[in-house]
Amino acid sequence: MCGSSMASEKQVKFVIVGGGIAGVTCAEQIASQFPSDEVCLLTASPLVKKVTNFRQVSKTLEEFDIEEQPSRVLEEKYPNLKVLQSAVRLLKAREHLLETEDGQRFFYRKLCLCSGGRPKLLSKDNPHVLGIRDTDSAQEFQKRLSTAKRIVVIGNGGIALELVYEVEGCEVIWAVKDKAIGNTFFDAGAAQFLIPSLEADRREASSVCKRARYTTDSSAAGHSGSSSELGSALGPDWHEGIELRGAKQSVRGVHIEYECEVEQIYTQQELLQSEHGTKTAELGVWPAYVQLTNGKIYGCDFIVSATGVVPNTDPFLPGNNFDVAADLGLLVDDHMRTSEADVFAAGDVCSAGWEPSSIWQQMRLWTQARQMGWYAARCMAADVLDEPIELDFCFELFSHITKFFNYKVVLLGKFNAQGLGQDHELLVRCTKGQEYVKVVLSGGRMVGAVLIGETDLEETFENLILNQMDLTRYGEELLNPNIDIEDYFD
């Protein structure tokens, strides 16, 4: 049995590596499609991440919750699915052999690598730097924050955006390398719409979070590897259910430093001995000091590194012949196949190597992890059954629903005019504190949109992007709030 902790050798038809969204979705799909075949899921974490409450909002838009669950929940639902908690030691792709850290050897027929990404840490071994990646590191952050008066947050992606908004009772210095916050998701206009939310009291959440939460039992048998390196990534509402409050009584205070990165991190002693030692008195006494590339130095209790992830390919590359993309992901074709026979990949670890639709791009978001895991399972099944399969429709249009600063955010197509150069125009409608709507037009046709707030425009705009209707004659009337745009395009 593949869940056994004893060293063994086993033939398994399907092996999936990774207990995150892509891996679990892939394992569930393949286990349900081949109920009489054993499926083995290898995960470095004692908890797995499962999609729940899935809802198809429109043709391509989808909403779902993510629950962390003990692996036995999966095994109870799928009797042919066995979950083994162990990291991968090595892969010999030509021999179809996978070996785990605890000595088990699996000869697979089809393998899907869904090992996700590992955080890009500013400084790997600095005790004053915390990378927030998995559940354990989020709990460590909560613990350290409870006694903190000031933290420095480095990064401008989704986790950084959520973190600076959620933290209370602690001063936050937020260093972003771009000219505006949320550069991955927004342009400067959308960023300016959101900035007042950082300066005001938090907006009340519109709905209660009903996700089940489990904690990691540190004594769980068979746990191996560093959780900071190997644990599956946080869910989109990772901060729900944990209080992110510092030691100060004041509610909040966020100061943003734009267009800068970290140049140096000092301890008290190191700062005293540096060329900046004379500034110690004005900077105050802190456990750590951060020097930014704009020359400014801030003292803080600790530094949060939220600068993104790199594909976690390390265990698989040695001795194999994988094609690797420029972003270091495993290159996959339109059937999620890597360059090694019978090895598939999905989620953050892979890079889409096919010619993409003109209105789709890979962004390593939760939505895409689920879609890729599900589609990879279907491709593996088609391979085994020798059946044809076409690229799924979900890869036709980029679409993502999320929430930032407690505003609903919908991103569609080339929402930031990615790759369009000067060949585009923007239409923008903004109602302060209520909604922000941006449309990207190219050649008179809608190719992207950003919707912040309860706009109810997502389905109409999705249709306009997909059918590529010429909108030239509508001009700015397209965003006229006094006109029901749906009436135009029924």
From Swiss-Prot:
GO terms for molecular function: oxidoreductase activity. It is an enzyme of class 1 (oxidoreductase). Binds 1 FAD per subunit. GO terms for cellular component: nucleus; sarcomere. Disruption phenotype: Morpholino-injected embryos show severe disruption of the musculature with fragmentation of the muscle fibers, altered sarcomeric structure, loss of fiber integrity and accumulation of actin at the myosepta. Disintegration of the myofibrils with mitochondrial infiltration of the resulting space, loss of Z-disk structures, and electron dense, nemaline-like bodies are observed by electron microscopy. It comes from the Eukaryota. Keywords: Cytoplasm, FAD, Flavoprotein, NADP, Nucleus, Oxidoreductase. Its cofactor is FAD. InterPro entries: FAD-bd_OxRdtase, FAD/NAD-bd_sf, FAD/NAD-binding_dom, FAD/NAD-linked_Rdtase_dimer_sf, Rubredoxin_C. It is found in: Nucleus; Cytoplasm; Cytoplasm, Myofibril, Sarcomere. Its EC number is 1.8.1.-. The keyword Isomerase does not apply. Its main location: nucleus. Belongs to the class-I pyridine nucleotide-disulfide oxidoreductase family. PYROXD1 subfamily. Probable FAD-dependent oxidoreductase; involved in the cellular oxidative stress response. Required for normal sarcomere structure and muscle fiber integrity. This is Pyridine nucleotide-disulfide oxidoreductase domain-containing protein 1. It comes from Danio rerio.
